[in-house]
Amino acid sequence: MNIRSNPETTRAAVTTGALPSSKKIYATPASAPDLRVPLREIILSEGAGEPNLPVYDTSGPYTDPTVVIDVNKGLPRPRTEWVKQRGGVEQYQGRDIKPEDNGNVGAAHAAKAFTAHHQPLRGLDSPPPRGEGSGVGGATPAAFARGADHPPMITQYEFARRGIITKEMIYVAERENLGRKQQLERAEAALADGESFGAAVPAFITPEFVRDEIARGRAIIPANINHGELEPMIIGRNFLTKINANIGNSAVTSSVEEEVDKMVWAIRWGADTVMDLSTGRNIHTTREWILRNSPVPIGTVPIYQALEKCEGDPVKLTWELYKDTLIEQAEQGVDYFTIHAGVRLQYIHLTASRVTGIVSRGGSIMAKWCLAHHKESFLYTHFDEICDLMRKYDVSFSLGDGLRPGSIADANDRAQFAELETLGELTKIAWAKGCQVMIEGPGHVPMHKIKINMDKQLKECGEAPFYTLGPLTTDIAPGYDHITSGIGAAMIGWFGCAMLCYVTPKEHLGLPDRNDVKTGVITYKIAAHAADLAKGHPAAQLRDDALSRARFEFRWQDQFNLGLDPDTAQAFHDETLPKDAHKVAHFCSMCGPKFCSMKITQDVRDYAAGLGDNEKAALYPVGHAGMTISGTIEDGMAQMSAKFKEMGSSVYLDAEKVKESNKALS
């Protein structure tokens, strides 16, 4: 159903309510009984003869009927207390909102500001004076575990390196296990069946495993300390493959209301993170509305807003303006920033011979700035300062691929890989500063060139999580690039990519609407799940097997509901067989009642089950374990062999002679 908010504040309406035959459930980790980790339970029909199936859920409170949704107030903020309990942070006034933050929009076009204001948190630069900052019962807060001579820890990476398991780590471990007590035998069998290309997927995810993966830099929990509404999730190749959905307004279309609706719509269908790529008016306000209503991590490309602040002219960009934009967005609670610090002056000429040049918006902005000033990129020269700033808020890096190929003709060229090598250098700097890092990747890459991208990224970037846009495997299908890219996404996900950025049917053609968002999300959920199956993820195949059993047993409603998109599955079925009676029929409109292979198979099974021992034995080949009547089969085979020789040992025989021979045998 839709809940419409107060029209005097905003006209936003978002989709709420459970998916068909599903309910929101919560798991409680043994080590943190105060946590409630969300899952979606798919309720199977009474005749299924098997338990309901819990699945990963990204939809937040919007599918919980016990929660009253009011987009004007935003979601609850339980994570804020987790952060404060760890210590090492301070609450402060924050910067004032400036006219340029919203593109100097006039009053006639200004969006309504979000009503609730939360003072931001930031990490302390140094420990508090001795005797201050103690935790509950006088205990030292976790942030100060390195001692009084060291600055407090703020980021998940710093806690992990110190050996401290945070609530976020406990939360994501429970989430990755889907709330089930693992059946290790089945899990190990699934792992043995898959090909993980060096990934170390365990049979059971523990908080300690999560901590270790983050400490090694192989995984991140994007979780700004100011995003209190967040339900933590993890990105890494040894976990479930995640997907991102892009939303955002532009200078010519969309509104705040539409973008909030698209965010809720995207997470309903399975988006693990959402990027707000707004480039038009009301950027700050749009982002605030999205963040305050988002249970998933939100990413941005700060250079887009910085460009709006200087009238859209890349030449006018400055480090000071960009730094102010980073602070603005970090205070709001953005969880990860795409920063194109690998676009260096010396690499730009490498793109001159490309078919499609520089296709990244952020990459082209920085390339123009570098050429106009004939200087090294300020993102590169000020990278240490960027790290210090992002660490204060635990904003994760998503190091952008500003020189990614925009056509398969440009795939894997020197410009692309030169930037990737620089991103590897920057990753090590960010880690040394205590920041979490993932790496962005292409783009447009034909199938035979995909694996080298994954292998080179792992080598150059120390196994930091890879996050790719597709890649698109061919350039000939405008309007269908969700398919051309879904092929590449499934492949690179199998090879080890941790998160896949969706592509919608509108790619290269226009701004996606909510229908395009759903199509993109479902397409990429398929790709991510296919990758998890191929890697041998221990829980991945449970849903496939449940749906296959429902299909074979003609449990149509279970078949719809176990799918990624129950609404579309049932709509297609009902186009030709709409009646309730058809939901229990043992056929569909493809084959009809007489030619359904599964119905025929069921009839054969039923027939075999009713046979006596002698009749069953006749169905088995010689020596088969099912043959229980000694000599019966051997005698029959010997008789038929003699008959074959008697008839002339020919494959094709005269019909009349065969009839006469059969009479003699009877």
UniProtKB/Swiss-Prot annotation:
Gene3D superfamilies from the UniProt entry: 6.10.250.620, Radical SAM ThiC family, central domain (3.20.20.540)
Cofactor(s) of this protein: [4Fe-4S] cluster
Family statement: Belongs to the ThiC family.
Binding site for [4Fe-4S] cluster: C588, C591, C596
GO terms for MF: 4 iron, 4 sulfur cluster binding; carbon-carbon lyase activity; zinc ion binding
UniProt-listed Enzyme Commission number(s): 4.1.99.17
Binding-site positions, substrate: N246, M275, Y304, H340, S360, R361, G362, D401, G402, L403, R404, E440, Y467
Annotated metabolic or biological route of this protein: Cofactor biosynthesis; thiamine diphosphate biosynthesis
Pfam family, one: ThiC-associated
InterPro entries per UniProt: ThiC, ThiC-associated_dom, ThiC/Bza_core_dom, ThiC/BzaA/B
Protein name listed in UniProt: Phosphomethylpyrimidine synthase
GO biological process: thiamine biosynthetic process; thiamine diphosphate biosynthetic process
HAMAP family: ThiC
Known role: Catalyzes the synthesis of the hydroxymethylpyrimidine phosphate (HMP-P) moiety of thiamine from aminoimidazole ribotide (AIR) in a radical S-adenosyl-L-methionine (SAM)-dependent reaction.
Oligomer and partners: Homodimer.
Species in which this protein is naturally found: Rhodopseudomonas palustris (strain ATCC BAA-98 / CGA009)
NCBIfam families xref list: PRK09284.1, PRK13352.1, thiC
GO cellular component: cytosol
Binding site for Zn(2+): H444, H508
Catalytic reaction(s) noted: 5-amino-1-(5-phospho-beta-D-ribosyl)imidazole + S-adenosyl-L-methionine = 4-amino-2-methyl-5-(phosphooxymethyl)pyrimidine + CO + 5'-deoxyadenosine + formate + L-methionine + 3 H(+)
Cofactor note: Binds 1 [4Fe-4S] cluster per subunit. The cluster is coordinated with 3 cysteines and an exchangeable S-adenosyl-L-methionine.
